[in-house]
């Protein structure tokens, strides 16, 4: 059973989603990453009774079992025209200042409104950047056709809030959150950021002309592989 404070947050999240739907007739995208926060916002959308289209943008470097979980959750899978390894072959590894991997594989418009599982508690930077439960964003040039309203229903949720909600609603998570015996071992974080070095090695194997001395993945690509949200 949820504590009173978390129950209030759940109610506020649901009201936010419903308020967006009241002023918008179309379907709202759920930016589904396969991570625990995505499963939470998907559940909230169901409880809110809104019209949504849950979409997983396949980055071509998905953690084992992720695509199976995405399909099991009934989420639509979109595939980019290129792959991460093709981009690396063309441009080398992305960096903090060159985020072409996210731009090509993950950050593009599908619908006019998008629900995202961003939380302030995830990092100090996110706590500084995200101040409101909704935000307007442009993908590409600042033109009306590129405009998206992003909605953050769990922006103020803590790691404990997410954990308790998952337990209370008995949500099934992606395989990466469980050990070999089926016990939930990583309900607070998938911990997949530690695999960025393995991904780098895989990229070097598949694209041998890339130097071993490459400084590695940008945070955005580590996040793609890590499914933190």
Please place each PLM-identified region on the residue numbering:
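Nucleotide-activated chemistry modules centered on ATP-dependent adenylation/adenylyltransferase
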Residues: 1-229
């Amino acid at each position: 059973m949820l504590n009173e404070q978390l129950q209030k947050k759940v109610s506020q999240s649901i009201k936010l989603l419903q308020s967006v739907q009241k002023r918008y007739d179309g379907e709202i995208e759920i930016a589904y990453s396969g991570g625990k926060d995505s499963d939470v916002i998907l559940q909230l959308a169901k409880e809110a009774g809104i019209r949504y289209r849950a979409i997983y943008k396949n980055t071509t470097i998905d953690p084992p079992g992720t695509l199976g979980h995405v399909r099991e959750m009934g989420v639509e899978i979109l595939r980019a025209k290129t792959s991460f390894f093709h981009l690396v072959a063309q441009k080398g590894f992305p960096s903090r200042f060159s985020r072409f991997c996210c731009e090509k594989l993950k950050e593009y418009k599908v619908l006019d409104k998008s629900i995202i599982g961003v939380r302030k508690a995830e990092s100090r930077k996110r706590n500084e950047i995200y101040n409101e439960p909704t935000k307007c964003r442009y993908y590409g040039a600042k033109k009306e056709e590129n405009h998206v309203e992003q909605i953050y229903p769990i922006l103020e949720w803590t790691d404990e809030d997410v954990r308790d909600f998952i337990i209370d609603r008995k949500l099934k998570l992606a395989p990466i959150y469980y050990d070999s015996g089926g016990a939930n071992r990583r309900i607070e974080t998938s911990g997949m950021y530690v695999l960025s070095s393995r991904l780098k090695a895989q990229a070097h194997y598949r694209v041998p002309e890339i130097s071993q001395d490459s400084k590695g993945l940008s945070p955005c690509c580590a996040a793609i592989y890590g499914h933190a949200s």
